[in-house]
Amino acid sequence: MSENTNIFINRELSWLKFNSRVLEQCKKDIPLLEKLKFLAIYCTNLDEFYMIRVAGLKQLFTAGIVVSGNDEMTPLDQLREIRAYLQNEKNELENEYFKIKNELANKGLFIKNYNELDEELSAKADEFFFTQIMPIIIPIAVDSTRPFPHLNNLSFALAVKLREENNPESVHFGMIRISRVLPRFVKVANDTYVPISSIVGRHAEEIFPGYKLISSAAFRVTRNADIVIEEEEADDFMIILEEGLKLRRRGAFVRLQVQKDADPEILEFLNAHLKIFYKDVYEYSIPITLDGLWEITSNKDFINLAYPPYAPKTLPPFDENVSIFSTMDKENILIYHPYESFDPVEKLIKEAAKDPKVISIRMTLYRVEKNSPIVQALIDAANDGKQVTAMVELKARFDEENNLHWAKALEQAGAHVIYGITGFKVHAKITQIIKKDAGKLKFYMHLGTGNYNGSSAKIYTDVSFFTTDEMFEKDTTNFFHILSGYNKNRKLDKLSMSPMQIKERLLEMIMMETEYGEEGRIVAKMNALVDSDMVKALCKASAAGVKIDLIVRGICCLRPGIKGVSENIRVISIVGKYLEHARIFYFKHNNPGFYISSADWMPRNLERRLELMTPIYDENLQNKLKEILKLQIKDNNLAFELKNSGSYEKVEVPDGCEKINNHEYLENYYNKLYKNIQKHRDDHISMIATKLLKES
């Protein structure tokens, strides 16, 4: 195969390859319920891709924009490639679903259609229908006086073709809308689930009395869900955002998912009203709401079909019986979630809320959980009279409503709530707490790569950095002043902030390694690499002989393996039990060489968001980051390597070498570390860690 010499890979096609790697997990030797989770994740990812990315390409095409980007693909080129790719991959999705369904049946867990149920389970399905479904579904007739209804984004329904009992020649069309509050897979026994559309279809004639069902087809619509808000024209951003959320429900239709082998007249009926381009219609022989598979994966009777549970560990120097402030007074601390517990982060905020010496708490909130103990602690602190400043990013996509709720609750408690800076999203993860003791101010700071969300911290890999170092006091204060006030000098000292500094600083460090040529070394771990300036700089470094390892979970627009250009760049993507979310950067000849950040290397992060990049100076903490990166580079079980063609190949275990699954390795490492600590409570953590590393 000839070498592709364009250094840029199309962003959308790269994303499709990432989602294919998610689907690929279903083929691996992992527990069956975990495979169901990956099916659900794949479908949820695809929903968002169509709602945002495909919808955006359609808008560009409709507007007549034909200019291509660095990858030389026009909007129409991309739409054609996306549709062809997904129509082909649909077959693979169906095959994996049926394969997993059969394997589950062999283990005694069943997914059955209504007509496959025995008499006892049919009766239970009927009871569920009449008591739980019938009262809240909406039967809709469509005729000259009752127009086709409005369908919200991701609405799920059953289209029906009916005839009157006393008039066999009559044909009527309608639908049965299935509420979001209803399960997509109904549990009729501990070991049996039924797609809800199968139950509703069986009872269509009870829903339309006096009519006979000729045929039915489950379907689901996807709308353009991108919200465009003119912030500069908004007097009250909260009101404008609430209006924008309503408009999301009315965006243009961009996709139709429908049951395979549907009655042609039903398809014609839907097409006449939805007017979705035929290549954006996907016909499925499997349930079209696989996001509902999460309902099955939580079945505790089949816990043996899931991964063994792992409990994140709280390790020294943290101690549940010791104040977190006194712990932070002694040293800087870096922990790696989810192997290490998120509890110290929550404990920091809770202690601050209760400590009478704390006078100020400032933090950024991007994606928080619905019942957030962190936000509740902030509310308690504000109610107690402490100065609380919360930057609540209302523009966090698909978390807007939850963030609106918390913003209002914080305001009612008396906190100063900031909604962001006009034209920018605030994506930085930072907390600053100030204590006043004996007339002196003491700063306690937390900087991280992940959200302040205890739920996601159990499944996302992220880094948390706790510090009282004076070098960060002024920077953290200035950052929050930038958020709350007027400040044109948006530059920090030790910390770097986008949009003014991070990209510039990264390019400087890449250039420094470039000057060292073959002695240079770069390792960068992130979620996505899209920014063209970063791609060009990395290729220039590679051409100079710098060895570069990129660990990019999702989109990567850099094409490796071009002779004389990017041949010294290796790109891997790790997909497994945990979602890789940490951003860690290493530059051999920089001082310090290690950084953590909230920012991916994308134009939106580097140019249109407020992000932070934090230098790590402590040698022991640098060593911890180094070990994380080394382990990921060596992974030969979860890693996929990006090839020059733009395709990804699974990294295989070399002959004579051991399998390295970095998720399993770290679980085992931290389990063993924790057990040893429990046995030797008086030993210092570094001594135990050294001993364990030697043993391993």
Swiss-Prot record:
GO BP of this protein: polyphosphate biosynthetic process
Tell me the organism: Campylobacter hominis (strain ATCC BAA-381 / DSM 21671 / CCUG 45161 / LMG 19568 / NCTC 13146 / CH001A)
- Asked if the keyword Signal belongs to this entry, the reply reads no
Give the record's GO CC terms.
polyphosphate kinase complex
PANTHER family to which the protein is assigned, alphabetical: POLYPHOSPHATE KINASE
**Cofactor requirements of the protein:** Mg(2+)
Residues at which Mg(2+) binds? R367, R397
PTM statement from Swiss-Prot or TrEMBL: An intermediate of this reaction is the autophosphorylated ppk in which a phosphate is covalently linked to a histidine residue through a N-P bond.
Q: What is the protein named?
A: Polyphosphate kinase
**Task performed by this protein:** Catalyzes the reversible transfer of the terminal phosphate of ATP to form a long-chain polyphosphate (polyP).
Q: One of this protein's Pfam families, by short name? A: PP_kinase_C
Write out the catalysed reaction.
Answer: [phosphate](n) + ATP = [phosphate](n+1) + ADP
Gene3D superfamilies from the entry? Endonuclease Chain A (3.30.870.10), Polyphosphate kinase middle domain (3.30.1840.10), Polyphosphate kinase N-terminal domain (1.20.58.310)
Q: Which HAMAP family match?
A: Polyphosphate_kinase
Give the domain of life: Bacteria
The active site annotation covers H427 (phosphohistidine intermediate)
Q: Which UniProt keywords apply?
A: ATP-binding, Kinase, Magnesium, Metal-binding, Nucleotide-binding, Phosphoprotein, Transferase
Its EC number(s): 2.7.4.1
State the NCBIfam families in the record: poly_P_kin, PRK05443.1-2, PRK05443.2-2, PRK05443.3-2
Q: Please report which protein family the annotation says this sequence is part of.
A: Belongs to the polyphosphate kinase 1 (PPK1) family.
Task: Please give the InterPro entries that the UniProt record associates with this protein.
Answer: PP_kinase (IPR003414), PP_kinase_C_1 (IPR041108), PP_kinase_middle (IPR024953), PP_kinase_middle_dom_sf (IPR036830), PPK_C_dom2 (IPR025200), PPK_N_dom (IPR025198), PPK_N_dom_sf (IPR036832)
Which residues does ATP bind?
N45, Y460, R553, H581
Keyword Iron-sulfur, does the record have it?
no
The GO molecular function terms of this record are: ATP binding; metal ion binding; polyphosphate kinase activity
